[in-house]
Amino acid sequence: MRYVYILQSIGDPDRYYVGQTEDLKARLQRHNAGEVTHTSKYRPWRVNTYIAFSDEEKAFDFERYLKTASATA
């Protein structure tokens, strides 16, 4: 199972991050521990939304869609 997730910064609620993972809990811990370069400045984070995909390719496609100008997370 792959999860596409949207994080929201607790300290800066207008700041969002989109990603994907197989282990959502562990990935959130890495974001909040400062181990992810793109999110370390705005921690702590909370999960705003997540969607589970059984098809890995569909998860990648959906994440890419959210990260493009055609979508707003």
What kind of region is each of these model predictions?
Residues 1-68, 72:
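GIY-YIG nuclease catalytic motif and its immediate N-terminal context
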